[in-house]
A protein has these predicted regions:
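Flexible loop/hinge segments that line or gate small-molecule binding clefts
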Residues: 124-159, 181, 275-284, 288
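Bacterial N-terminal signal peptides that target proteins for export
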Residues: 2-13
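Hinge/cleft segment of the Venus flytrap/periplasmic-binding protein
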Residues: 30-59, 305-380
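An alpha-beta-alpha
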Residues: 61, 65, 79-81, 164-210, ...
Length: 380
């Protein structure tokens, strides 16, 4: 026969068991939350928004890279500087364009309890499940373009492409008598970048003397991929006047044209990203005429600062634009200085606002409002 004390112990044990079951069920339900899936327009970021609880995770900022192209390395430089300034441990992984490897690397970061993760996805769809788990764990997840993310970085993609396309169209009219064979090196594996190439086609559409002789995505979006694709294109179209795309593939295409002995000073090679090698080519005054800057170390530094703020329980932007600007010989010196000193840019509101625009607010307590749709500031 049970004593009163034993019955009380049993009741307490039962209550505790029920609580644990409820708590486990509640936690599981939380993991099933899907974030913001319906596209919306975020208001301007409020830097004075209330703080919330900080996550109880390691003060580590990790960067999961798709590859080691210059644009990605620039992001890493900015992140490393921010981590140093905010006393965070900085760690990186490189997937070498292998989607399965990236999933394993991100899962390793998640299971080790890193407090902040920035990711440049290889395959956004396959990576999404582990990113959602990472977000729900309480980790800051900053994504370069595709969702899901605590805070998503994008560029106004149509405007970025139009800035390059309009510059090419102007050059064709003024320097090539309105006639040109054009190559567009696209990025079909990342649908979120497609507005760039829509804009380039729109810019060239009204020029009757323009023939787009190739509109194709290289097998790999890097210098080697651009080189290989351009070699193939030159077999069918040995005379090319204009090449447009991301800097890394356009640089590869330029190398292929040089290798074939088909380079001319009046050609127009133009890219996007403001990569170091592209800037060096522009300085030479040769066929590489322009690069549309997406200052990677500047926004990398900003993402690192947001990661540190998140870990302190502060409210950070849900989304951020990196604004495009056309690099010319006249403004390259200032641009290079900004890339080398992104912390100075970030601390100067006037300079920062020429590169970045921030939207929405989110913190650890409101992480159920993570971005799970392809956000763009150009959405109407």
């Amino acid at each position: 026969m049970q004593t009163k004390f034993e019955r009380l112990k049993l009741s307490a044990f039962t209550a505790l068991a029920l609580f644990l079951i409820f708590d486990h069920t509640h936690a599981f339900a939380q993991k099933e939350a899907s974030g913001i899936t319906v596209p919306r327009i975020f208001p301007t970021f409020d830097s004075n928004a209330p703080t919330c609880n900080p996550p109880l995770l390691k003060k580590v900022l990790a960067f999961a890279q798709d590859n080691e192209r210059e644009f990605i390395l620039g992001i890493g430089r900015g992140l490393a500087m921010a981590a140093k300034d905010r006393d965070l441990v900085y760690s990186t992984s490189v997937a070498q364009n292998d989607g399965t490897r990236m999933i394993e690397q991100v899962e390793s970061f998640r299971s080790s309890g890193v407090g902040a993760l920035v990711v440049a996805p290889v395959d956004p769809a396959s990576l999404a499940p582990v990113l959602r788990k990472t977000i729900w764990q309480g980790t800051y997840v900053g994504a370069v373009v595709p969702p899901p993310a605590t805070s998503l970085l994008n560029a106004p993609q149509y405007l970025t492409g139009k800035t390059l396309g309009d510059s090419a169209a102007k050059y064709i009219r003024e320097k090539l008598s309105g006639k040109a064979n054009v190559v567009l090196l696209t990025h079909d594996s990342l649908q979120f970048l497609s507005p760039r190439f829509v804009a380039m086609r729109d810019s060239l559409r009204d020029l009757p003397g323009v023939a787009i002789v190739a509109d194709i995505s290289p097998t790999t979006v890097n210098k080697q991929g651009g080189f290989a694709m351009m070699q193939t294109i030159l077999l069918a179209h040995p005379e090319v006047d204009v090449v447009l795309g991301a800097d890394t593939v356009v640089l590869g295409a330029l190398a292929a044209v040089r290798d074939a002995g088909k380079v001319r000073p009046d050609q127009f090679f133009g890219g996007i990203d403001g990569e170091t090698e592209a800037v060096a080519e522009i300085k030479k005054g040769g066929p590489y005429k322009i690069s549309i800057s997406l200052a990677s170390s500047v926004f990398g530094y900003a993402m690192g600062q947001h990661a540190a703020d998140w870990l302190e329980g502060k409210s950070i932007p849900q989304a951020m634009d990196i604004l495009p600007s056309a690099l010319t010989i006249a403004n390259i010196a200032r641009y290079e200085s900004d890339l080398e000193n992104p912390g100075e840019v970030y601390r100067d509101p006037v300079r920062r606002d020429t590169y970045l625009k921030m939207y929405g607010n989110i913190c650890y307590d409101s992480r159920d409002q993570y971005v799970n749709f392809p956000w763009s500031s150009e959405r109407k």
